[in-house]
């Protein structure tokens, strides 16, 4: 009989039956505090809470105990039934003493209650209704127009009825003539399409039974997660919760841009004139638009309308890009014209035979296609111009920014090669993990961890001498694992967003400090004087001229150029003619007429030696009262025999 209480206790408390559940529930009702177990990625945490507390209080208790934010609590391990952070629903109505709830960290901005901060009720309802039970971010992402159009497009590849294989009537469909998905491998291989388009890749990932409800692009992290309280900061401590995972580089199967098209060959020819004149390399930014590319299913094409050349110091072998104080002005003019910065272009040309115009082939499969330094520069520029994406955890993923290299091919002719770097390369460059090597331009190098920075291990796979796939540490790293090919071309029928020059001399391009290429008032006067009154819209439709007028300091044209830029964008001659009657443009025309009628003027800036010698001569060189005059525009003191200013070229 002494063993009876022990047997009863084992029967009640150790066996998962009705008696055990009944006794546990009675203890839950009688006790003022109940025990709730919370399972998260860090382990199991026990929370004591009153059964009469609401679920909002439970969320606050979990947040204070685990030091987390942006989470949800679920009843099941597979996160099906969520406990809403309600201020009216009690803990006792949803949970029992000893129950376990499962914590899930939410990506992006969460609509769930995780703190005592007051939320706007209307915003809460909107985010909850628009994206229920989904892992995608709840904030709204404004994608590019071409992305919005492709998201709504059907995307399937239509096929005609095969007269040999199809045995049905014209209205029927079979496996030989039914439409294909845009990611069909046989179609891509047949048409020699190397990479999937970005939207075809999204269609492939969202084609399952759940229709991609939980599909999301996660950002690659190469840094230690900040704020870990389990140990001292790096280098004194690190744990699995804050340590970034090792990265295995894979060749990217998709690309954000499938083709780069220059509207006409004259755009590139004007860019190459600097190299032809000086022999120095040159770099520029591509301005244009994105449009649908029909040759690739759900493809995107970058159409280039102009090339802007920022301040730079170049030699025969190198280019050093300088800070550009007018970068925002250029972007403002481009935006008013319906353009945006879509890529960058640089030259790598060495003359082989100047008499026949051939160049040396210095890039190819036997050497390299793009250097590690250029790859890092492309990654930095792509990080500055991210691609808005509604499937990304932070609202952006990848980039449509392209890289164009002008170099020599096998036939020793000048040709263009297009590239983009992968999302993995962008992450390595963003977190300062990738550097170039000194002796091999085709090899990069992943930094080693130091006291100031922890760098995760980066691996890539290649085949050894016996054909086996082996994993290598990315020290060094062939940059070909980070590249995506993007074809570059020109259309058969040229397109002209801006003026089509025939025999007239175009307006000089900015930041070219050589004779005949300077942008000054004398160049503006000579350029506009070559056009008639009825050709004003054609004369003004030059991207480099519009940028020069926009950033001109002598006349306040910037505040009045809105209608002019709209006229150029819409090619409206009547609206352009209305701009000619504006007072500030009339003043500019009068200055041009006065400058054209004078005998002075200069097309270049005075040298430093001339200025120094003039200053050294002092009052012996000129009489300030009789033999000099002061420019009303730039206040420079000019010699008396000049009829236009030696600095700004404006008339006396």
Swiss-Prot record:
SMART domains linked: ZnF_RBZ
Species for this entry: Drosophila melanogaster (Fruit fly)
InterPro entries: MPN (IPR037518), Npl4 (IPR016563), NPL4_C (IPR007717), Npl4_Ub-like_dom (IPR024682), NPL4_Zn-bd_put (IPR007716), Ubiquitin-like_domsf (IPR029071), Znf_RanBP2 (IPR001876), Znf_RanBP2_sf (IPR036443)
GO BP terms, alphabetized: cellular response to virus; negative regulation of smoothened signaling pathway; proteasome-mediated ubiquitin-dependent protein catabolic process; ubiquitin-dependent protein catabolic process
Single annotated GO MF: K11-linked polyubiquitin modification-dependent protein binding
Similarity annotation: Belongs to the NPL4 family.
Family annotation (CDD domains): MPN_NPL4 (cd08061)
UniProt entry tagged with the keyword Membrane: no
UniProt keyword Translocase present: no
Modification type Phosphothreonine: residues: 114, 117
Zinc fingers typed RanBP2-type, residue spans: 625-652
Functional note: May be part of a complex that binds ubiquitinated proteins and that is necessary for the export of misfolded proteins from the ER to the cytoplasm, where they are degraded by the proteasome.
Domain of life: Eukaryota
Gene encoding the protein: Npl4
Protein name (Swiss-Prot/TrEMBL): Nuclear protein localization protein 4 homolog
Domain named MPN: residues: 260-397
Sites bearing Phosphoserine, chain numbering: 115, 138
GO cellular component labels: cytosol; nucleoplasm; nucleus
């Amino acid at each position: 009989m002494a063993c009876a209480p022990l047997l009863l206790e084992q029967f009640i408390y150790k066996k998962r039956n009705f008696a055990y559940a009944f006794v546990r529930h009675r203890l839950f009702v009688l006790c003022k505090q109940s025990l709730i177990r919370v399972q998260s990625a860090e382990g199991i945490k026990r929370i004591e809470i009153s059964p009469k507390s609401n679920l909002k209080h439970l969320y606050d208790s979990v947040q204070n105990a685990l030091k987390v934010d942006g989470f949800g609590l679920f009843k099941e391990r597979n996160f099906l039934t969520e406990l809403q952070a309600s201020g009216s629903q009690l803990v006792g109505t949803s949970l029992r003493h000893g129950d376990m709830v499962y914590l899930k960290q939410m990506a992006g901005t969460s609509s769930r209650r995780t703190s005592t901060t007051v939320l706007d009720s209307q915003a809460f309802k909107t985010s909850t209704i628009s994206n229920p039970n989904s892992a995608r971010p709840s904030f709204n992402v404004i994608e590019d127009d071409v992305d919005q159009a492709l998201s709504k497009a059907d995307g399937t590849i239509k096929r005609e009825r095969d007269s040999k294989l199809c045995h049905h009537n014209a209205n029927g469909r079979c496996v030989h003539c039914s439409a294909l998905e845009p990611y069909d491998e046989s179609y891509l291989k047949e048409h020699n399409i190397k990479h999937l388009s970005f939207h075809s890749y999204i269609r492939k990932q969202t084609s399952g039974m759940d229709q991609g409800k939980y599909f999301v692009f996660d950002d690659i992290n190469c840094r230690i997660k900040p704020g870990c309280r389990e140990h001292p900061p790096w280098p004194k401590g690190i744990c699995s919760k804050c340590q970034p995972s090792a990265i295995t580089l894979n060749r990217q199967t998709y690309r954000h841009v499938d083709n780069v098209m220059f509207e006409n060959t004259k755009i590139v020819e004007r860019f190459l004139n600097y190299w032809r004149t000086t022999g120095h390399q040159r770099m520029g930014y591509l301005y244009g638009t994105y449009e649908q590319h029909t040759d690739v299913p759900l493809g995107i094409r970058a159409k280039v309308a102009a090339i802007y050349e920022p301040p730079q110091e170049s030699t025969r072998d190198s280019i050093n890009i300088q800070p550009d104080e007018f970068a925002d002005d250029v972007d403002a003019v481009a935006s008013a014209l319906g353009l945006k910065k879509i890529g960058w272009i640089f030259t790598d040309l060495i003359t082989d035979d100047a008499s026949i115009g051939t160049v040396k082939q210095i890039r190819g499969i036997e050497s390299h296609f793009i250097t590690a330094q250029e790859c890092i520069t492309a990654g930095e520029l792509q990080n500055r111009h991210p691609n808005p994406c509604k499937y990304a955890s932070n609202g952006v993923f990848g980039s449509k920014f392209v890289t164009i290299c002008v170099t020599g091919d096998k036939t020793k002719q000048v040709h263009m090669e297009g590239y983009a770097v992968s999302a993995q390369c962008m992450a390595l460059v963003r977190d300062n993990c990738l550097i170039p090597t000194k002796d091999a331009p085709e090899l990069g190098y992943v930094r080693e961890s130091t006291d100031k920075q922890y760098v995760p291990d980066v691996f890539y796979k290649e085949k050894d001498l016996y054909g086996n796939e082996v994993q290598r540490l990315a020290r060094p790293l062939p940059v070909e694992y980070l590249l995506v090919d993007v074809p570059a071309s020109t259309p058969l029928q040229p397109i002209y967003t801006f003026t089509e020059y025939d025999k007239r001399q175009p307006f000089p391009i900015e930041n070219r400090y050589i004779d005949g290429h300077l942008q000054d008032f004398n160049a503006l006067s000579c350029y506009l004087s070559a056009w008639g009154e009825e050709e004003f819209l054609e004369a003004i439709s030059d991207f480099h001229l519009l940028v020069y007028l926009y950033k001109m300091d002598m006349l306040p044209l910037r505040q009045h150029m809105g209608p002019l830029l709209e006229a150029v964008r819409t090619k409206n001659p009547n609206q352009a003619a209305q701009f000619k009657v504006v007072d500030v443009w009339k003043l500019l025309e009068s200055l041009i007429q006065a400058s054209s009628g004078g005998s002075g003027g200069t097309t270049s800036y005075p040298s430093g030696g001339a200025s120094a010698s003039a200053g050294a001569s002092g009052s012996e060189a000129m009489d300030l009262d009789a033999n000099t005059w002061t420019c009303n525009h730039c206040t420079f003191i000019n010699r008396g025999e000049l009829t236009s200013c030696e600095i700004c070229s404006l008339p006396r």
